[in-house]
């Protein structure tokens, strides 16, 4: 029996053809965009259940040594980052004898005087100070805003692209309209996706590689690395979904071969509490500007750079179908309020439809509500959820996870919400240069109807 080849590929256009096809299934057209399936469906595919796995907890903090970096890299460059409250400057030259060596010449505007420093990796230094009356104002943005340079990584709200690589015209399993380079150019600073291990190679697939396979993890990370190389003042977060719960060692080769390892940031301790994170300027000056998390099976003892998500970040309800978007903690389960307040958190704001056909259960983006879901205000809006989370937890979410970030009540509305949470003003342009996967926004009328005759009945919204 052949595995299902196509299930629901044109929901975005208001027509939902079959993604379920085997030798005992026949598909006929009823005209006017309607489709009739007859026969039997024997393959079981399910994404409409809450992912779960082993959740790590620590009774004490583990301090990491400085020799945990994998691979060797050399960086030589000059950077200038200034703080809005700074009134002086410092020049530092640093060399390192670690396996990952670096040689930097850095101009950093900090403090209240003119400092010249010479230091080594053992943190010993000498300095000379001379008074200056010239005030210095930061003009170099970090992650798009000069105010962010002096802020801790854990004190910034970032927009996250849910299933970032899944860009495919006319495929219901797609979650974004623009490819990753456009996403990063527009202001996305977290890239989230799921991986599947097939014959020793990690692929980016949505639920099943027969449903949507957009290529290898290595190719995707190579594109991301190219962007990071050319944007030296940006910190990018990557959240890997380990769908098959494979050993974390499988992820080392794609990260190394893509060149990303040269930029991967490694925490000084495990786990990282809310106040343990460095500032963006610290990360930028170190050259380590890629923060990598994995949801399940992370082993930071063996791979310190591949950080366990749920011991350092919690999430609101997974793939929500409730437009009220409650800001309650769901994963990891049974987390105390005190522990939740002491780590970062992500607001899942990607509204879904739960579609079931026989033994197939899928969560697909509710495209009918995209303009409202990604809006700055109103019922079901990203803005309202962000405000609710801030009121509930006393601080804004660190990450706002969204589908089709380019839609909302205006172009860039999701970034405007993040800017409000960060107490800055969004003035960017959005979105993309040319759509990599144009979608048809649902209109007010019904464009298609699906009839399924497999012993079950499905009534779906086709807009």
Label every PLM stretch briefly.
Residues 2-463:
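Catalytic cores of phosphodiester-bond hydrolases, prominently lipid phosphodiesterases
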């Amino acid at each position: 029996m052949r595995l299902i080849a196509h299930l629901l590929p044109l929901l975005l256009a208001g027509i939902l053809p079959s993604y379920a096809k085997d030798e005992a299934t026949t598909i006929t057209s009823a005209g006017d965009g309607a489709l009739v399936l007859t026969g039997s469906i024997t393959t079981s595919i399910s994404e409409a259940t809450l992912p779960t796995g082993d959740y790590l907890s620590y009774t004490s903090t583990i301090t990491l040594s400085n020799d945990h970096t994998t691979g060797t890299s050399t960086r030589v460059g000059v950077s200038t980052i200034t703080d809005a409250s700074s009134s002086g400057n410092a020049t530092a030259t640093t060399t390192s004898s670690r396996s990952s060596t670096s040689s930097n010449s850095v101009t950093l505007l900090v403090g209240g005087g003119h400092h010249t420093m010479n230091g080594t990796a053992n943190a010993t230094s000498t300095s000379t100070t001379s008074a200056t009356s010239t005030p210095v104002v930061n003009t170099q943005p970090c992650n798009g805003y000069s105010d962010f340079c002096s802020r801790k990584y854990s004190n910034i709200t970032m927009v996250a692209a849910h299933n970032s690589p899944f860009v495919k015209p006319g495929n219901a399993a797609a979650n974004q309209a623009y490819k990753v380079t456009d996403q990063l150019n527009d202001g996305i600073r977290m890239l989230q996706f799921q991986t599947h291990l097939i014959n020793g190679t990690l692929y980016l697939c949505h639920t099943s590689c027969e449903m949507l396979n957009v290529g290898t993890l290595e190719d995707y990370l190579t594109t991301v690395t190219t962007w990071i190389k050319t944007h030296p003042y940006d910190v990018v977060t990557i959240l890997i979904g380990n769908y098959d719960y494979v050993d974390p060692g499988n992820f080392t080769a794609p990260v190394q071969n893509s060149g990303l390892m040269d930029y991967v940031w490694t925490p000084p301790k495990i786990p990282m509490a809310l106040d343990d994170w460095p500032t963006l300027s610290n990360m930028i000056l170190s050259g380590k500007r890629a923060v990598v998390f994995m949801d399940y099976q992370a082993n930071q003892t063996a791979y310190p750079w591949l950080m366990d998500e749920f011991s350092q970040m919690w999430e609101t309800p997974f793939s929500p179908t409730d437009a009220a978007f409650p800001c309650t903690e769901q994963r990891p389960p049974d987390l105390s309020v005190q522990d939740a307040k002491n780590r970062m958190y992500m607001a899942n704001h990607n509204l879904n439809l739960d579609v079931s056909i026989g033994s197939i259960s899928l969560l697909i983006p509710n495209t009918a509500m995209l303009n409202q879901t990604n809006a700055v205000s109103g019922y079901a809006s990203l803005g309202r959820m962000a405000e609710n989370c801030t009121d509930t937890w006393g601080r804004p979410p660190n990450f706002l996870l969204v589908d089709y970030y380019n839609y909302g009540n205006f172009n860039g509305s999701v970034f405007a919400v993040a800017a409000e949470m960060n107490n800055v003003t969004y003035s960017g342009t959005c979105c993309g240069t040319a759509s990599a996967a144009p979608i048809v926004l649902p209109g007010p009328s019904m464009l298609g109807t699906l009839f399924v005759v497999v012993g079950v009945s499905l009534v779906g919204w086709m807009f």
